[in-house]
Amino acid sequence: MKKDIHPAYVETQVTCTCGATFTTRSTATSGTIHADVCSQCHPFYTGKQKILDTGGRVARFEARYAKKAAADAKK
């Protein structure tokens, strides 16, 4: 095997947006990683359901097809 071709594998502190931190090993040169979700705040692991911002999409869908239904009713 060739020597000195692999990146340094160092201890890395992972910080989640919920505030949880844990240490792992990574090739990240800064030694820190910022994660959006972790096992302490992800709904799959916590069993809690988070409400996603789908209300806007549903409202747009209903408005679009309400217009189509109204146009079909006029015909």
UniProtKB/Swiss-Prot annotation:
Name under which the protein is recorded: Large ribosomal subunit protein bL31
Assembly information from the UniProt record: Part of the 50S ribosomal subunit.
Co-factor(s): Zn(2+)
Job description of the protein: Binds the 23S rRNA.
Entry's cofactor comment: Binds 1 zinc ion per subunit.
UniProt-annotated binding residues for Zn(2+): C16, C18, C38, C41
Gene Ontology cellular-component terms listed: ribonucleoprotein complex; ribosome
Key words, A-Z: Metal-binding, Ribonucleoprotein, Ribosomal protein, RNA-binding, rRNA-binding, Zinc
GO molecular function: metal ion binding; rRNA binding; structural constituent of ribosome
Annotated family: Belongs to the bacterial ribosomal protein bL31 family. Type A subfamily.
GO terms, biological process: translation
